[in-house]
Every structure is written in C-alpha cells, then in structure tokens.
Amino acid sequence: MVDTVDKLGYFQAITGLEDADLCTEILQAHGWDLELAISSFTSSDQDASSSAVDGGGNNRDHDHNNATVTPDYPPRGIVDDTELVMRDDGGGNRGPGVAWRIITLPISIVSGSLGLVSGAIGLGIWAAGGVLSYSLGMLGFRSGRGGGSESARLVSVSSAVGEAMEFVALFDRDYGSNNAFKIDFVVEGFMDALQRSRSSFKLLFVYLHSPDHPDTPVFCGGTLCNEAVVAFVNENFVSWGGSIRSSEGFKMSNSLKASRFPFCAVVMPAANQRIALLQQVEGPKSPEEMLAILQRIVEDSSPTLVTARVEAEERRTNLRLREEQDAAYRAALEADQAREQQRQEEKERLEREAAEAERKLKEEEEARERAAREAEERQAARVRMRQEKALALGEEPEKGPDVTQVLVRFPNGERKGRMFKSETKIQTLYDYVDSLGLLDTEEYSLITNFPRTVYGRDKESMSLKDAGLHPQASLFIEIN
C-alpha cells in the first residue's frame, strides 16, 4: 500500500500546492483518501460537470490547451468565470505541472498595462471527475471507502456574509485584542467587496487566512496589525478576508491558486465579471516588505484609478446635466401644457358664455315673439269680443218713456252716449263700453258723482231703472 509520503507528493503535484503543512491538513481531514481530498479541493458544493481533456502532447504545449469544467457555485458573491491579472514578483511562483494538466488547464495570456507584467488565470480550479478517477486509478490511488460511505466535507457551506462576519470576529479575537491597529475588513461577500472597491475607486486587498499554518500568527500579529501597514491599507484599499476553511475563502484560494501561506492578493474589477490580479504575496513578509509591495501597486495603479474616477465623475456630471435638462424640459413642457390648458379653459369659458348669451338672446326673442303673439291674440280676442258685444246690443231704441238715455265719460275726456231700454241690465252698459274699444283694460267700474255711486260688477244684474239710472244717467269710468 502506498504510504502517506507518496500520497502527499501526488496531492501536491496534482493540486499545485507547495505548502506541505496545508496539504497534510487537507489529507488528514479526508482520512488520507487521496481521491476524496482532491475531489473536495477542486470541486464546489455540488458535483462538477466533466469535460473532455486531450491527454496527448508534451510539457511545453500545456499553456495552449483550453479544457475547463464550469462549476456550480451556490454561495452568493462567487463568479464562475473570472480572470485575474498575475504579477510574477520573483517569489518562485510556478505554473501547473504535468499532472495538473490532466485536471484543468488555465488559459495564459500575457499583456502589459500600467507598467505591470500581467497574465490571466480563470477564477476556479475545476476537475473532470471521470478523468481524475481514471488518472488516480492509473497511479494506484483508488478510494479505500467501503459500503458507499462518504467522508465529511472539508468546507461547510454558509452564507458569504455569515462567513465574513465569522472571519472578522475570529481575527479580532485572536489578534485585535493585543494590537491597537487592525485592518478594516468588510463584513460582506467577495463580490460585494469587489463592487465596493469599484464604487470607491480603490483596489481590493484580499487576505486568505490559514488558521493552522505556523506562519499565520506572526504574519497576522506582526505584519497585518502593524501601524504603518494598517494605516496604508485602510487608506488606499477596500479589504476583504476569508478563512480557507469557509466556503468562499476556500474557493478563492482555489481561484487564486494559493500554494503558500500566509497569502495576500491585490485585485481590481475587470469587464464581464472578471477581476485583474495585480499582485499576490505568498509566504510570510515583514511589515517593511509588505508596505513596499503595496505602495508600488498603489503607485502603478493610481493612473487607472484616477482615470476611472474622472470618467465616473464625467458620467455623473453628464447624467446630472441630462437630468437637469430633462427636468427643465419637463418644466417647460408642463408650463406649456398649463398655458395650453388655461387657453383651452378660457376658450371653453368664452364659448360657454357666448352660448349662454345666445341662448338668452334666443329666449328673449322667443319671449318677445310669444308676447307679441299673445298681444295679437288678445287684441284679436278683444276685437272679436267687441264685435260680439256690439252685435249683442242690438239696435238702439227710439226715445220714449221706457227708454233711458246714458252718457259715459272716458278717462281721456271723450264722451259716448246711447239709448237703452229701462229694463236693460247694467251688464249691458259694460258690454257697450267694451264694444267701443276705447279702453285697454277690462278692469274698470261705472260710477256717478252726485251722489257718488259705484255700479260695480256686483250690480251687473240690476236693471237701469232699479239702479236709479232712469230716465237718464251720466256715468264716469274709473280704472280699478
């Protein structure tokens, strides 16, 4: 049976990790089950989909192969397709070896920007399960698991914010109580921290924490809590930290290919959910070394950040100008609409007033016409009435003992006289006055002055003789 030393060597060769203590810790956590340890290291919480890998070719061709497996990352804040721009700082960072090519082949791109020697590596170390199992079988490291039982996972799944809170709390507990200075790690997921750095136009300082590594206490307490380092990092960076025992910290260590600890990196957002790796620092560093590295990165990146800030400010200014122009346009439009509405309301008011005036004029005209018709009708009725009453009077009788002579004086001074039989009713005298047509009203009374006697409508049934008007009478007309 292959001993633990051989398993450790194969695990380092396949994963690319140089830290023997970390590799031993991972293998121990999986009961020295090599296949399970590699599978846990190279996969997410769900089983990774496999992709075909061309196993032919020699060592010098491994940078030109493109065979990747896209993983499924449930936790928030992890992107499944991100590039990092890598600087080789002469620290001995090496690329994947021959055995690494069997599992995943990162794309290597060399480009220059801001004086930085840059390469690109994808976020995520992904394994094709079938190829991995076959390769380990060929090497003689098949799983020793029996009865289908599974070892416990190395990484427990929790929310990105919860993991960040736990990391900050543990870091403060272990190193913050004895140090007056500490880095302001954000309590949020990696992608949220990346977005924060983008919006604040700062670089993102990443620290991956290996709690059991022998160099971790000295590095955290002596370097990360150094006054000058803390002041510089808090001033110039957004800082995010994660434990490699957490889901997001573990995946970031895979994505950044962290092979030595303590591990720090400086990244910045790039297009299409990608990040640029500007610097990675592996292994213990003194405060002076760390500060020099970070100062150089800030100096080199300053033109880009200043340009981004200026462009963002220009965009905000342009947006504000557009909003002000839109607001002015809307205000002018609303004013025009208000004026148009006022003009329309005034027009409608004038139209209503004109219609009302026309209606009243029409009503007045109709009233005049109606009054004229009624007057004509009344006049015609009076004419007919006079004619009818004149006919009803009959012929004037000749003077005689039973004939009464009546003289009527009208208000205008005109006098009219006629002979009536003494038995004639006073009603006939009224009919006689009406038949003359000299009055415009029917509301009048016949009176005598000496003595004053009113022969009103209540006496119409009396005869002239009974009323004392025989043989002659002089009557006046009094308008009621």
From Swiss-Prot:
InterPro entries: FAF1_2-like_UAS, Thioredoxin-like_sf, UAS, Ubiquitin-like_domsf, UBX_dom, UBX_domain-protein. The keyword Coiled coil applies. SUPFAM superfamilies: Thioredoxin-like, Ubiquitin-like. GO terms for biological process: lipid droplet disassembly. Keywords: Coiled coil, Ubl conjugation pathway. It comes from Arabidopsis thaliana. Residues 47-78, 335-383 are annotated as: Disordered. Gene3D superfamilies: DNA helicase RuvA subunit, C-terminal domain (1.10.8.10), Glutaredoxin (3.40.30.10), Phosphatidylinositol 3-kinase Catalytic Subunit, Chain A, domain 1 (3.10.20.90). Residues 399-477 form the UBX domain. CDD domains: UAS (cd02958), UBA_FAF (cd14353), UBX (cd01767). Transmembrane segments: none annotated. Residues 330-389 form a coiled coil. This is Plant UBX domain-containing protein 10. Residues 336-383 have a biased composition (Basic and acidic residues).
